[in-house]
Regions:
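Core alpha/beta catalytic barrel or barrel-like domain that forms the active/cofactor pocket
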Residues: 85, 92-95, 125, 164-170, ...
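Internal maturation/activation junctions in enzymes
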Residues: 287, 329, 589-612, 638-720, ...
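Alpha-helix capping and helix-loop boundary segments enriched in small/acidic/polar residues
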Residues: 9-13, 33-36, 102, 253-256, ...
Length: 839
């Protein structure tokens, strides 16, 4: 028997559909029904159909189901069924109206899926249809009508109906894929291999992909694509991917789909795998496309492309010489050119009034060099997208500190300002001890070059008790000139700048160096632009300059020792999207991303040879997290609670253990990093310093000692300001600033909604500015035990915060073992995030 559908098509009669409809009508009112009774009513409907051949259409059959329910006395169920039919009719009418207004029949299945997935009344397509009509004009082109439809969905996103941002993303995804399909048709691209061949020929894709993978492997990789994972993206995330990360034509049209982007990145990350390469391609693709992991902005943007600079963070130790300073400026320019962020340690540079070649008072000090750093940041923009970004670090005992702390403030001599750099201060434990015990004690500022010339050592080359001993030695040496202020004066300058500008960043040098697993090979003087990296550093040293003849030409050859020019590759676990209670699954994701990050080291394009040398010596990683507040909220865990601290203690210990074991297992297969012997990893000190004494940790320590470690450094929590938007989660370890707000960008209002905002999570998402900051600092201290590097840890203060309250937060952070503090975010202050570290 054949049944006529509403669109005129014919399909075979299926009595299961009638049975399901009857069953749903009972379920909707909470009553049970026996299967025998359902069969009886289905039989009655079938008798009617067989007796009336002219009534064999969907509407007539549904009318008969209503009558059968009422004839059997099921009035509530019949009422529910009638309401269901009415809603389905409304839905069909809304879909047909949108399709007609958009002049696009292919929209119908997309709208049907949306209607099926979002059944609540606040997501009715009738509402979308009405909104769309207000935007849609008859003279619009079809593409503009699709844009208007997307805009309509975006503007319907509210605190009460947050999922419209996912509906808007589906419509935008359809528009994108429609545009890409038309482009592919125009250039005769019919497969993923064809696509890669075209992109390679256009020099939009790196030749190395097709040179390394066979056509059969590319075809196999294409089968990994799961287009339905586009539905995981919200509008803000998809919009950001389209604008910044997808490959575009030279006329600026996106020609790469979202899933093709993730697969292309996976192909690049797995390119050097010797065994099970396609398995690793699939595993890398899965963690990225499921939004379980986000790679840092440079990796996400540049992997698979001809110029594949994949690293986020670079740190240079600036020498105290004209040649060295200008080389560091050039290093910054080269890093910035390829989209990296920079940290620069100026603690070795002589202070203002210091000697130059014996002439007293000749040195201009670090502030003059700050102006050049500032101008370099402005002049050399990141891939033409935005100006360079650099944090400049100075020790709290440096003679130029008072002027340094006023670089970004609005008062004072503008010739002494550098508004486009981010100042940061390195503190020893002694400073915080004195601030805690008696803030009125004197604090002495010295010139590092003068200490070296008179005392024969560099004070900055020591930490802990040895530093304190030498600092007191300097204080007691009358030959050393100094500036003496009280600790209170220094603190006042720091806090005033922090409240006004958000900076200086904080680097607790003794905490960092005492926990350094590679202290046998160097010293950590400072951190990077976003304060999460802490690795061995040393300056580049000039060796010689020779004039030679090469093929009849005279050439000048400059030789230098590379030092430790820090570079780090970042990725983040999206905690809000991961099964954190399932240790096995979480461990598998961590192991996968550690392998991906280790591969980045070998496939990376380095803007400087010094960076390549250091990266291959240490093979350092920076695995962090995003979605921290998201993960707490969906579990109903309040930020200001012991439950929060206990939960993250367990989660971060699991992540750390998985990362250490993954690195050790890779070392067994591929070899350890160069300086493993003598490291805290090898001696076991890494584990004892952190109190890792359980049987699991003891066994892992023995395993590491036997197998080695592939990577010198593993964990670092970056801010993830951009990539957390892509993943539709909260940034880094920060709490949300607002549950819902509208952000104006290029004339459009974009909704920003806390992830999975609902009646259940609403009150758990407490604003960062309303959270007691002591809980934030305590949580950072709990996490720090499990993080071998550092964290981009922000503090959030309101306008009624006193200087004493802010100082207490700094002291609590120091007492809690927190290594670094990033911005102090005042409610009246807006600060600009670093894109490079936005992993």
């Amino acid at each position: 028997m054949e049944i006529i559908k509403r669109n005129g098509n014919v399909e075979q009669y299926d009595k299961k559909k009638i049975a399901v409809a009857i069953q749903k009508s009972f379920a909707s009112v909470g009553t049970e029904i026996k299967v025998v009774l359902i069969d009886e009513m289905v039989g009655a409907v079938e008798q009617f159909i067989e007796a009336h051949s002219d009534m064999r259409n969907v509407e007539s059959i549904q009318d008969q189901v209503e009558k059968t329910l009422m004839q059997n006395g099921f009035y509530d169920e019949a009422k529910s069924y009638i309401l269901f039919r009415f809603q389905r009719t409304e839905r069909r009418n809304a879909i047909n109206s949108i399709v007609a207004d958009a002049e696009d029949e292919d929209l119908k299945p997309i709208l049907k899926k949306i209607s099926s997935d979002y059944t609540s009344v606040e997501y009715s397509l009738l509402l979308l249809s009405d909104k769309f009509k207000s935007f849609c004009k008859d003279d619009m082109k079809q593409a503009d009508k699709l844009s208007a439809l997307v805009k309509a969905a975006v503007e319907m996103t509210t605190q009460e109906a947050p999922n419209w941002e996912f509906i808007a993303a589906r419509l935008l995804s359809y528009k994108l894929n429609r545009s890409i399909a038309a482009f592919e048709e125009s250039v005769s691209v019919h497969s993923f291999y064809d696509k890669l061949r075209y992109l390679t020929d256009e020099r939009l894709y790196g030749e190395y992909i097709l040179a390394s993978y066979s056509p059969e492997e590319i075809a196999q990789a294409a089968t990994f694509i799961k287009e339905e994972r586009n539905d995981l993206l919200n509008y803000s995330g998809l919009d950001l991917l389209m604008k910044r990360y997808l490959i575009r034509t030279y006329s600026n049209k996106p020609i790469e789909s979202i899933q093709e982007m993730y697969l292309g990145i996976a192909l690049h990350l797995a390119i050097n795998e010797k065994e099970d390469r396609m398995l690793w391609v699939q595993k890398f693709y899965d963690i990225l496309s499921k939004l379980e992991v986000t790679m840092a902005t440079p990796t996400l943007s540049n992997a698979r492309k001809p110029f594949h600079q994949l690293s986020s963070c670079f740190i240079d130790t600036v020498p105290d010489s004209l040649e060295g300073i200008y080389r560091s400026l050039d290093n910054f320019a080269q890093v910035s050119k390829f989209g990296g962020g920079m940290g620069m340690y100026f603690g070795k540079v002589r202070a203002a009034g210091g000697k130059i070649r014996g002439f007293k008072g000749a040195a201009g000090g670090v502030i003059r060099w700050m102006k050049l750093v500032n101008d370099t940041a402005v002049a050399v923009d990141q891939l033409g997208m935005r100006q360079g970004a650099v944090a400049v670090y100075l020790d709290v005992w440096h003679k130029d500190l008072p002027e340094f702390l006023q670089l970004r403030t609005n008062n004072g001599d503008d010739r002494m300002k550098a508004h486009d750099i981010f100042p940061a201060v390195c503190y020893p434990d002694l400073f915080w001890k004195m601030a805690q015990e008696d803030i009125n004690q004197p604090w002495h500022l010295f010139c590092p070059n003068e200490i070296l010339s008179i005392k024969g050592y560099c004070l900055e080359d020591y930490y802990g008790e040895e530093w304190e001993k030498r600092y007191i030695d300097c204080v007691n040496d009358a030959r050393l000139t100094r500036r003496t202020l009280s600790v209170k004066d220094i603190v006042r300058l720091v806090l005033r700048s922090a409240v006004e500008t958000g900076t200086p960043f904080t680097f607790n040098r003794d905490h960092v160096n005492k926990a350094n697993p590679n202290g046998h090979k160097g010293m950590i003087y400072c951190s990077n632009l976003c304060t999460e990296i802490a690795q061995n550093m040393s300056e580049i040293e000039s060796v010689s300059t020779e004039v030679k003849t090469d093929d009849g030409d005279t050439v000048v050859v400059r030789a230098s020792k590379p030092g430790d020019f820090v570079v780090c590759n970042l990725a983040s676990l999206s905690l809000g999207h991961l099964p954190l209670e399932n240790e096995s699954e979480l461990t598998d994701v961590v192991r996968t991303v550690v392998r991906a990050l280790d591969n980045v080291i070998d496939i990376n394009f380095y803007p400087l040879p010094y960076a390549k040398i250091t990266n291959q010596r240490y093979r350092s990683l920076g695995l962090g997290v995003s979605g921290y507040h998201h993960a707490l909220a969906v579990r109903g865990i309040k930020w200001e609670s012991q439950e929060h601290l206990d939960f993250v203690d367990k989660v971060f210990e699991t992540i750390n253990r998985a990362a250490v074991e993954a690195s050790s297992d890779i070392a067994k297969q591929k070899g350890s990093y160069k300086y493993f012997e003598g490291s805290d990893w090898q001696t076991g000190e890494y584990f004892t310093k952190r109190g890792y004494t359980s049987p699991e940790w003891t066994a892992l320590a023995a395993k590491v000692k036997e197998q080695g470690m592939r990577n010198a450094y593993l964990l670092a929590i970056a801010p993830t300001s951009s990539t957390s938007i892509i993943a539709g989660t909260t940034a880094g370890t920060d709490p949300v600033m607002q549950r819902f707000f509208l952000e104006e960008k290029k004339g459009a209002m974009l909704p920003r909604v806390a992830p999975e905002l609902s009646d259940r999570t609403f009150w758990v998402y407490k604003s960062a500015y309303h959270i007691e900051q002591q809980w934030t600092v305590r949580a950072a201290g709990v996490r720090q035990r499990h993080i071998d590097q550092a964290q981009s840890q922000n503090l959030y203060i309101t306008n009624d915060f006193s200087m004493r309250q802010l100082l207490e937060l700094y002291l609590l952070a120091w007492r809690s073992g927190v290594k670094t503090i990033y911005y102090v975010r005042s409610k009246s202050l807006e600060v600009e995030e670093c894109e490079s570290c936005a992993s």
